[in-house]
C-alpha cells in the first residue's frame, strides 16, 4: 500500500532532473526486532529542491504509513510541501494531512503560495473533513487551507490517489511559474527552514510511533540525521 504514491513522486522528481542522494543503510531500510515493521526511506535533490524525502512504514495489515516533505532551496521562499498519510487496518481508518507549509503567516504570502489548495479542498470536500486543531497549531507552519482527512476505506480507495496527485502537481506548477521572492531574502528563508525543523522536531507526533516500533536510540538518530537535519543548526 502507498507504493504507487512513492512511484508517482519518483517520476515527478525525475522530471525535475532530480537525483537520489545516498543515505545510511540503517535509514534506507530498517526492521524492528521481530520484522513485523519495516521502514524504507528515500532522499532526493534537484536544482529547485535542496531536499525531498520520502518515508514508507509497512506494518502489514495493522498499519501503513506514507510521509513526504519537500524543502525548496534557500533562494526560494516557496512553502514546504508536507504530507502524512496513515492507514489503520484493524479499525479501517484513514488519517491524512496535506499542506503547503508556509514559512511565514503573512496574509499576502499565504494567498500567493498556499491559497490554490482551496480549490483542491473544494473539489474533494468529502475527503477534507476534520480540522484537528487539537493536534496541529494553525498559527505555526500550517496554512489556512491545510487538507485533513479522518476517513475510511472509501476515502482511501476513491479519493486518495487523485487528491495526492493534484496536491503535488499544483505545488510543482507554482514553482514552475518562477515566482519572484517578495517576502523573504535567502538568509531569512534559511532561518525559517531551520525554525521549521526545530518546530517539527519538538511537535511531530510520529516520534512516539517510531519509538514504539524501533526503539528510542534509532529513532533519535533517524529524526536528527534524516527527518529534520536542520534541527541542530544554530540561528545567529
Curated annotation (Swiss-Prot):
Give the record's keywords alphabetically: Oxidoreductase
The keyword Oxidoreductase appears for this protein: yes
Q: Which GO terms describe its biological process?
A: phytochromobilin biosynthetic process
- A GO term for molecular function: 15,16-dihydrobiliverdin:ferredoxin oxidoreductase activity
Return the Gene3D superfamilies for the record: 3.40.1500.20
Q: EC annotation?
A: 1.3.7.2
> Which cysteine residues pair off into disulfide bonds?
none
Record field: catalytic activity: 15,16-dihydrobiliverdin + oxidized 2[4Fe-4S]-[ferredoxin] = biliverdin IXalpha + reduced 2[4Fe-4S]-[ferredoxin] + 2 H(+)
Q: Which family does it belong to?
A: Belongs to the HY2 family.
Q: What NCBIfam families does the database record attribute to this sequence?
A: PRK13246.1
What is this protein's function per UniProt?
Catalyzes the two-electron reduction of biliverdin IX-alpha at the C15 methine bridge.
Q: Record's HAMAP family?
A: PebA
Q: What protein name applies here?
A: 15,16-dihydrobiliverdin:ferredoxin oxidoreductase
User: Mind giving the lineage of the organism this protein is from?
Assistant: Bacteria, Bacillati, Cyanobacteriota, Cyanophyceae, Synechococcales
Gene name as annotated: pebA
